Amino acid sequence: MARVTVQEAADKIGNRFDLILTAARRARQLQLHVREPLVPEENDKPTVIALREIEKGLINGQIMDQLENNDAIQQEVAEQEAISFLADVQANA
């Protein structure tokens, strides 16, 4: 099990409060298997993995925003494609 110091992770983010928000968002992604870990799991829980990623500078608030924006765009494109497909099927029926 890797040792994580919250102070080092907070230094990467800027303050404890933003650290908590960023780590929670990332841990939720890991827990729901939305994204793969960027560091070896080593039997750690998602919160510890998130803190390790932050500590190594692999994740921060801006990166999380970009990832979530990309996911939202992909979701919107998929929905539009599904609507278009259903409209074509209905028109040809």
Curated annotation (Swiss-Prot):
Keywords: DNA-directed RNA polymerase, Nucleotidyltransferase, Transcription, Transferase. Its EC number is 2.7.7.6. GO terms for molecular function: DNA binding; DNA-directed RNA polymerase activity. The keyword Transcription applies. It catalyses: RNA(n) + a ribonucleoside 5'-triphosphate = RNA(n+1) + diphosphate. InterPro entries: DNA-dir_RNA_pol_omega, Pol_omega/Rpo6/RPB6, RPB6/omega-like_sf. One of its GO terms (biological process) is DNA-templated transcription. Transmembrane segments: none annotated. It comes from the Bacteria. It holds the Pfam family RNA_pol_Rpb6. The keyword Protein biosynthesis does not apply. It is an enzyme of class 2 (transferase). Signal peptide: none annotated. One of its GO terms (cellular component) is DNA-directed RNA polymerase complex. Gene3D superfamilies: 3.90.940.10. Promotes RNA polymerase assembly. Latches the N- and C-terminal regions of the beta' subunit thereby facilitating its interaction with the beta and alpha subunits. Belongs to the RNA polymerase subunit omega family. The RNAP catalytic core consists of 2 alpha, 1 beta, 1 beta' and 1 omega subunit. When a sigma factor is associated with the core the holoenzyme is formed, which can initiate transcription. PANTHER family: DNA-DIRECTED RNA POLYMERASE SUBUNIT OMEGA. This is DNA-directed RNA polymerase subunit omega. The gene is rpoZ.
